[in-house]
Amino acid sequence: MARATLAALALFGSLVVHGMTWAASTPEDAKALVKKAVALVKASGKDKALAEFNNSKGAFVQNNGELYIFVIDQAGKTLANGANSKLVGKNVHDLRDVDGRYFIREMIDIAGSKGEGWTDYKWNNAATNTMQMKSTYFEKVDDLIIGCGVYK
């Protein structure tokens, strides 16, 4: 019975982890959340938007924390992180994935040259405690780089 239930949940794009169920997020969901965040910065200003992005119970943390907005500046300093407030104020410029890839540097470079983009890297999925590929969409707004990622 349990295997049939898990199979049925998998068919509907859901994850079951430690007794919790939620719909798996898509790259389109991540991009839409970044677009919504960019609109808030433009409409309300940087300070108000950053406060909202850092609100772990706010509109920019979704699907039980699977989707959240993070913001870095051009130097790699974290200005907002809806999932981990301990990162705010920390410089993540030299952060690498398990394969040694400097994915934050890549985001900064692409944002500076193209204004927006995607980057893929391996990261620990806290929900499953496994290393997985993650794809992050980001956009540059003034001196901010606003991003949101999903596990593949």
Regions found by a protein language model. Give the residues of each.
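N-terminal membrane-sensor/transducer module of prokaryotic signaling receptors
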Residues: 2-152
